[in-house]
């Protein structure tokens, strides 16, 4: 038993849990031990860590072990089973050399990272180590800066420890990382106003940071102006639904976006439209003091009706400039989060019409959610939880995206690290990507490859299909097309 071992490369999101390979779990763990915890130890510490085992996953206690050993994306961990549920863990760097822990371990690991010529080659906002945001008035008022969820998740940033913000000239400011328990948002507070003043950043300005040091104290470098441009069409912008935007029923519009589209002086009304064509009319205001545009009276209703919560990342596209401006809500895909603009807001009230409209849409949303649950239950008995029935809407086809039922993904151990392929009735495979589309409920969605898959199977909008889950490897699975399904839901 002492020679049994397995290894795992660490991927984005590894702090939440670690999945034990299926083959190792079936051969060495399942049915052998009644205990629900494992003991982990390493040569770096005399501490023995107790970690909860939930099925094939290491959960409670794993995050503390990972943080204590400064594990990062790209590292490899090797588990050697010593006895029963006791494991010795060896940590390897991306070069597959064992990580040496000591007084200078941070410097040694930093040198190892710098040996990779591609480590800091990219400077655009498409680089996962970068993020762009705008200086919201409330961020100056409350002296804090929020980190986009996508950036935090991709780089394994946690809400504790130290972080240094460095400007282009090398001058640095020290901060303590914090995290909001309610929503998991990571932020820094105290000193943000000083940083902005020293670097000429004003309300409405867009800035871009690049993570240049991960080991020990994190270091973010402010990139030159102009580096914040992302791959989005100039008629688009990405926004973060900050808690204050909902509290004050207001959303600030990026100065750069308004200026590039020649609408930075406009006032009056603005229409927000969702993917289904339903519209909301909001007030468009211009702050003369700073030249910042904002929309108010109806923003909260729009978010409520479209299932947007605090921390959601959304993309708008300006589809009409003449007359009343129209912003269309686009599909919210995680790859665009790296250029998210963390908009926060000032106080303004909601009108009665928006509130009534919100209540009406919430009722419709609840009816649809209940209907969706009925569809899932029809095909998810304990003996066949590998099957799932999905109803296709016009939006799913248009955006080539589809959400998966939460019970289905949880029962089958599907997560963001899972590689998924779609298999049509002709035996052809279609690649798709699993993305987290609802951060609070941990709901996953399939993005890409979906449109071609349904066309190959002759499926049209508003039809339902049954798929079968087939695991190929530990983290690789296939959703196989079984048949079309007629659902009679009353």
UniProtKB/Swiss-Prot annotation:
CDD domains for this protein: B3_DNA (cd10017)
Cross-referenced Gene3D superfamilies: DNA-binding pseudobarrel domain
Domain of life assignment: Eukaryota
UniProt GO molecular function: DNA binding
DNA-binding region: 3-95, 130-226, 236-333, 387-484
One Pfam entry name: B3
An annotated GO cellular component: nucleus
PANTHER family: B3 DOMAIN-CONTAINING PROTEIN REM-LIKE 3-RELATED (PTHR31674), TF-B3 DOMAIN-CONTAINING PROTEIN (PTHR31674:SF66)
Name under which the protein is recorded: B3 domain-containing protein REM14
Gene: REM14
């Amino acid at each position: 038993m002492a020679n049994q071992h397995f290894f795992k490369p660490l991927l984005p999101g590894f702090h939440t849990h670690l999945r034990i390979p299926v083959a190792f779990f079936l051969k060495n763990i399942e049915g052998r031990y009644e205990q629900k915890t494992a003991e982990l130890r390493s040569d770096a510490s005399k501490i023995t860590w107790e970690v909860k085992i939930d099925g094939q996953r290491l959960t409670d206690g794993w995050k503390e072990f990972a943080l204590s050993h400064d594990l990062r994306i790209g590292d490899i961990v090797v588990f050697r089973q010593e006895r029963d549920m006791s494991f010795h863990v060896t940590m390897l760097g991306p070069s597959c050399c064992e990580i040496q822990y000591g007084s200078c371990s941070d410097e040694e690991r930093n040198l190892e990272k710098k040996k990779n010529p591609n480590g800091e080659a990219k400077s655009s906002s498409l680089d996962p180590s970068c993020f762009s945001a705008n200086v919201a008035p409330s961020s100056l008022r409350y002296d804090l800066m929020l980190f986009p969820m996508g950036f935090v998740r991709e780089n394994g940033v946690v809400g504790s420890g130290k972080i240094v913000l460095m400007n282009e000239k090398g001058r640095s400011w020290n901060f303590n990382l914090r995290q909001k328990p309610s929503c998991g948002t990571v932020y820094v507070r105290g000193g943000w106003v000083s940083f902005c003043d020293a670097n000429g950043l004003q309300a409405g300005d867009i800035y871009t940071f690049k993570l240049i040091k991960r080991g020990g104290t994190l270091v973010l470098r402010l990139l030159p102006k102009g580096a914040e441009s992302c791959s989005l069409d100039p008629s688009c912008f990405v926004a973060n639904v900050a808690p204050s935007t909902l509290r004050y029923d207001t959303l600030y519009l990026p100065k750069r976006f308004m200026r590039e589209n020649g609408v930075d002086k406009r006032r009056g009304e603005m229409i927000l439209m969702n993917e289904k064509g339903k519209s909301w009319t909001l007030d468009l205001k211009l702050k003369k003091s700073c030249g910042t545009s904002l929309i108010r009276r109806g923003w909260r209703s729009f978010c409520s009706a479209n299932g947007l919560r605090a921390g959601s990342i959304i993309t708008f596209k300006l589809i009409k400039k003449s007359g009343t401006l129209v912003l269309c809500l686009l599909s919210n895909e995680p790859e665009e989060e790296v250029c998210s603009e963390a908009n926060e807001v000032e106080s303004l009230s909601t009108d009665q019409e928006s509130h009534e409209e919100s209540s009406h849409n919430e009722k419709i949303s609840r009816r649809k959610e209940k209907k969706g649950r009925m569809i899932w239950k029809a095909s998810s008995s304990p003996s066949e939880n590998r099957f799932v029935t999905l109803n296709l809407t016009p939006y799913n086809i248009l955006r080539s995206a589809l959400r998966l039922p939460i019970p289905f993904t949880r029962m089958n151990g599907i997560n963001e690290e899972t590689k998924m392929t779609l298999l049509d009735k002709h035996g052809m495979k279609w690649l798709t990507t699993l993305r987290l589309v609802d951060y609070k409920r941990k709901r996953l969605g399939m993005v890409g490859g979906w449109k071609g898959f349904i066309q190959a199977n002759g499926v049209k909008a508003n039809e339902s299909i049954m798929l079968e889950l087939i695991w190929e490897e530990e983290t690789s699975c296939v959703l196989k097309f079984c048949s079309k399904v007629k659902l009679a839901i009353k």
